[in-house]
A protein has these predicted regions:
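Transmembrane core module of solute transporters
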Residues: 21-33, 37-70, 251-255, 263, ...
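Transmembrane-helix bundle of Major Facilitator Superfamily
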Residues: 2-201, 351, 378-379, 390
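Interfacial helix-cap and linker-helix signal at transmembrane-aqueous boundaries
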Residues: 45-46, 83-84, 173-179, 234, ...
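Small-residue-rich transmembrane alpha-helices and their cytosolic helix-loop interfaces
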Residues: 28, 66, 70, 156-164, ...
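Hydrophobic transmembrane-helix bundles of small-molecule transporters
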Residues: 179-294, 302, 615-623
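Transmembrane-helix exit segments and adjacent C-terminal regions of multi-pass membrane proteins
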Residues: 1-32, 288, 356-359, 368, ...
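C-terminal module of multi-pass small-molecule transporters
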Residues: 76, 88-99, 104-107, 111-120, ...
Length: 623
């Protein structure tokens, strides 16, 4: 049965919007938890499947288990958002919940070992990411359809809080469950996914307006292949190549990057020619949409890779130096990062509500300015810091991200015409998710550049001091920097594996004890790691400052106005098109720019021709 959501302003509509909010918040929370839950659980997963991720040949599995979920989300989110516009956002969202749940179950029934088990997890994570893409691509559009303009900031704010909080909840949940059984980190999502699937099918209803258009197959293929090549090139660029610490000069990396960029260029040309493009380039003529996405892109680049750096800093150096065993560092790293979650939980909902009244610009801009200043503050922390100032900076950084994320997301969605919200949300998601992967590539590159020159010399001197033979010390000192970073990320002590019994058994007992103890490798890594952090935090501060500048340029509060579709009327089973008027929630100095429409950056007003809307068959209103 084709069901439509109730008429706005009725009790049924009021109940429906809260059902939509709670269900989409659950979906976003599950997706974000599964983006981060493996960061902490990886050591137990690799031990469980009997695969050593520090062996160069196995680095593929480490990278793709971590990044495969994000890569597929970045590639598919705009396509699936567009499908939501064409065939119903709720229908695509419901399908996503079901797909996500099925692959969560499949991930937990892996009884293989070695590379076969690693390949299975990579494949199932990609499938799980496809389900997550359906959820991510359509949740914002569903909320924007369900809530009136003066409540969208609040609704999207709660949704954003769930998304960011889930990243940190995933760290703690992974640390708690993985030591019991690594399969629990996957199966834990299944009951919640089943609940969300049944709930969504029972309660969520599609908007009464759909877009009538053909699928842009050429655009979809060019975009998917081009972006995949670029992101794959980035993941391999941070790995060693020959005698180089990184692979940016590798023909394979250069070929994938150049090939991907060429295909994306062709994609841009195709999208400007076809009648119903997947990527509606005209949307970038809307000032609020363009500025909001640029700010989101820069913010994601500035902070996306930092979670990994904080985890490596805590797991690989700070916690071992403070007496925590390597096997316990993953859980405690997640716990020590909770102040950032607390800051975001405080600021996210409040800024979303206030942005409904005062507009996004003051909150999003100040959030990025504060975030930039916190990265400057991190520059002044010693590598073996006192936890109190670290926790304060983490909390302020989370608060800053909360100030930015909710208002910025609401401003982007408010700027879109109703029949383009799925595609627009997908385009915005592409920027955010691709920027997260790009950010990790940038931050890993900066970290490797920072430690590559000092690490070999530091390792050699430390090993020789503990009476390790020169030949063995020389071999270990050529440890690729990326291996050191991965060891820190995984909470591994690589010395016992790198030296092996053949060397350790011939050393004095005291030297062998020092080399395999908690503090030897973290102490040696501390100085080179600090050099890398300086470069990374400086980059993060600059990126967030540029995001603040983009946020300033978004202009005053703006909500897209569009005429009602032909034949639409206010009756049960139909949906009124959005109307934008000045109201009591709009301040005189922050007018709603309904007439400004698109072309604001060019200084003129123009109309964005929507695809032909299709009115769904009339049906009785249900909740």
């Amino acid at each position: 049965m084709n069901r439509t959501r109730p008429v706005p302003g009725t009790p049924d509509a009021d109940r429906y919007k809260w059902s939509a909010l709670f269900n989409t918040t659950l979906g976003v929370l599950l997706v974000s938890i599964n983006e981060s839950i493996l960061i902490i659980a990886l050591p137990d997963i690799f031990r469980g499947i009997k695969l050593n991720p520090l062996v160069p040949a196995n680095s593929f599995y480490l990278l793709w288990i971590l990044l495969g979920f994000m890569l597929v989300t970045a590639v598919l989110v705009v396509t699936l958002g567009r499908l939501g516009d064409l065939y119903g956002r709720v229908r695509m969202y419901n399908l996503g919940f079901a797909v996500f749940t099925v692959f969560s179950v499949l991930l937990s029934v892996n009884w293989m070992h070695g590379t076969a088990a690693g390949a299975f997890i990579v494949g199932m994570r990609i499938g799980q990411g496809i389900g997550g893409s359906f959820l991510f691509a359509n949740s914002s559009a569903i909320l924007t359809d369900a809530f009136p303009e003066n409540q969208r900031g609040m609704a999207l704010g709660i949704n954003n809080v769930a998304g960011i909080a889930g990243m940190f909840i995933g760290l703690v949940v992974g640390g708690l469950l993985a030591p019991i059984d690594w399969r629990l980190v996957f199966i834990v999502s299944a009951p919640f996914g089943l609940l969300g699937t049944v709930w969504a099918y029972a309660k969520l209803h599609d908007s009464g307006v759909r877009t009538r258009a053909r699928i842009d197959w050429w655009g979809n293929v060019l975009f998917a292949v081009g972006l995949t090549l670029v992101l794959v090139g980035i993941t391999y660029g941070i790995q060693p190549y020959g005698t180089s610490a990184m692979g940016w000069t590798s023909p394979r990396v250069l070929g994938t990057l150049i090939g991907g960029l060429v295909l994306l260029t062709v994609f841009g040309v195709v999208e400007s020619k076809v009648a119903s493009p997947m990527f509606r380039l005209q949307l970038f003529r809307i000032r609020a949409f363009l500025a909001g996405n640029i700010a989101s892109l820069l913010a994601a680049i500035g902070r996306g890779g930092l979670m990994f750096l904080f985890v490596m800093w805590l797991q690989g150096i700070w916690l071992p130096l403070h007496g925590v065993s390597f096997t316990d560092t993953p859980l405690w790293a997640g716990i020590y990062m909770l102040p950032m979650t607390g800051g975001f939980l405080v600021a996210g909902p409040i800024s979303g509500v206030l942005s409904d009244r005062y507009g996004a610009r003051p909150f999003a801009t100040s959030g990025m300015v504060i975030a930039s200043l916190t990265f400057v503050g991190f520059l002044f922390l010693p590598i073996d810091f006192s936890y109190t100032p670290f926790a304060i900076l983490m909390a302020i950084n989370g608060l800053a991200m909360g100030l930015f994320a909710s208002p910025n997301r609401a401003a982007i969605m408010n700027s879109l015409p109703p029949d383009q919200r799925g595609a627009g949300a997908g385009m915005s998601g592409v920027f955010q998710n691709a920027a997260m992967v790009l950010s990790m590539g940038i931050f890993f590159t900066l970290m490797i550049s920072g430690i590559a020159s000092a690490l070999p010399r530091t390792l050699y001197r430390g090993l020789v001091t503990q009476h390790v033979p020169v030949a063995a010390a020389t071999a270990v000192s050529h440890l690729p920097p990326i291996t050191s970073l991965f060891a820190s990320l995984l909470g591994y002590d690589p010395m016992s594996k790198l030296l092996g019994p053949a060397v350790l058994s011939h050393l004095p007992a005291h030297s062998a004890h020092v080399l395999t103890g908690r503090q030897f490798f973290p102490t040696l890594l501390a100085t080179p790691f600090s050099d890398g952090l300086t470069i990374a935090f400086t980059f993060g501060a600059v990126a967030c400052a540029l995001a603040a500048l983009a946020s300033v340029l978004r202009g005053q509060k703006y909500v897209h106005a569009v005429a009602a579709p032909s034949g639409a009327d206010a009756r049960p089973g139909t949906v009124e098109a959005d109307r934008t008027t000045s109201n009591e929630d709009t301040r005189a100095d922050e007018p709603v720019l309904a007439a400004q429409g698109v072309g604001a950056f060019a200084g003129h007003s123009s109309a964005l021709p929507p695809d032909e809307p299709e009115q769904l068959p009339e049906a009785s209103a249900t909740t």
